[in-house]
Amino acid sequence: MEVILDKRNEMEIVFEGETHTLCNVLRSILMEDEKVKAAAYSIDHPIVGEPQLYIRAGSPKKSLKAAAETLRDRCDEFRRLIESL
């Protein structure tokens, strides 16, 4: 992960070695946060491009951390459901 833009209300991050999967779920969770004004990602080239996630919020770092924690919690819940089968 490399931060390429870090301003008070904006942040852009490159996720090396990742694909749509991680960025799309993070974007979705970020947009559930009322403090997030915008969240989007792009991949310049489908084969060799690295995803870039853009966040505009009151505190993008706090919003990203909260989104990551929410994702972890949802993954833990999913794992428990699968294990209970």
From Swiss-Prot:
One of its GO terms (molecular function) is DNA-directed RNA polymerase activity. It comes from the Archaea. One of its GO terms (biological process) is DNA-templated transcription. GO terms for cellular component: cytoplasm; DNA-directed RNA polymerase complex. SUPFAM superfamilies: RBP11-like subunits of RNA polymerase (SSF55257). Keywords: Cytoplasm, DNA-directed RNA polymerase, Nucleotidyltransferase, Transcription, Transferase. Its EC number is 2.7.7.6. It is found in: Cytoplasm. Its main location: cytoplasm. Pfam families: RNA_pol_L_2 (PF13656). DNA-dependent RNA polymerase (RNAP) catalyzes the transcription of DNA into RNA using the four ribonucleoside triphosphates as substrates. Belongs to the archaeal Rpo11/eukaryotic RPB11/RPC19 RNA polymerase subunit family. Part of the RNA polymerase complex. NCBIfam families: PRK01146.2-4. This is DNA-directed RNA polymerase subunit Rpo11. It comes from Methanothermobacter thermautotrophicus (strain ATCC 29096 / DSM 1053 / JCM 10044 / NBRC 100330 / Delta H) (Methanobacterium thermoautotrophicum).
